Amino acid sequence: MREIMNKELLKKVIELKSNGLTIGEIAEELNVSMETARYLVLNAEKLLKEEEKAIKLENVDIFIDWKNIGSSANRLKYISSIIVDILKSRNIEFDTVVGVSTSGVPIATLVASELGKELTIYIPKKHISEEGKKITGSISQNFSAVNYKRAVIIDDVVTSGSTLKECIKQLKEVCSPKLVVVLIDKSGLDEIEGVPLIPLIRIGAVNVEQK
């Protein structure tokens, strides 16, 4: 497989790295997996300097840029209204909306507000520290607790599902996760840790042989 590397993406990686962001934070910012973010951080400067247009990758990842939605509170409100409609159509009973930090938080906030539900924030371990230490994600103490509650989880993009898997495992220790809703799904998963996954948009790669 061959992956076309966008020069603007490479420049963005270099900028984020120079600003002191960790690999986990860069993965979150670009909506790519930790493996892809690590590869980009290690190779972006070389790729940009040599102006390579294509590199071979064992696995293809897709760069998602949804800032035209995220930069507007009004547009985010439209997205949250779609999620609210989905939740109502499924007749799911729940007590709190869990927003996965960072990008899932604004959407979760709007959904919780529209439905009159509590708001919980989950901070993944990739935002707490880098590799090498045994750490877990955490539930922010500044927002609603989840103990013994029914929860709907909201995130922006699911790539491999590892962050949501981590989140669900931790939540299951104290509450009952009912559903995961994401803006964009790149994983192709229908459920994570037994919890149904509902995407607004699902992205898949198709290999087309050139003749």
From Swiss-Prot:
Superkingdom field: Archaea
Keyword DNA-binding: yes
Keyword terms: DNA-binding, Transcription, Transcription regulation
Molecular functions (GO terms): DNA binding; orotate phosphoribosyltransferase activity
Single GO BP term: regulation of gene expression
UniProt keyword Transferase, yes or no: no
InterPro entries: GfcR-like, PRibTrfase_dom, PRTase-like, RNA_pol_sigma_r3/r4-like
Description of its domains: Contains an N-terminal DNA-binding winged helix-turn-helix domain and a C-terminal regulatory domain (or effector binding domain) resembling phosphoribosyltransferase (PRT) domain.
Family (UniProt): Belongs to the purine/pyrimidine phosphoribosyltransferase family. GfcR subfamily.
HAMAP family for this protein: GfcR (MF_01214)
Annotated protein name in UniProt: Transcriptional regulator GfcR
Organism expressing this protein natively: Methanocaldococcus jannaschii (strain ATCC 43067 / DSM 2661 / JAL-1 / JCM 10045 / NBRC 100440) (Methanococcus jannaschii)
Biological classification of the source: Archaea, Methanobacteriati, Methanobacteriota, Methanomada group, Methanococci
Gene assigned in the entry: gfcR
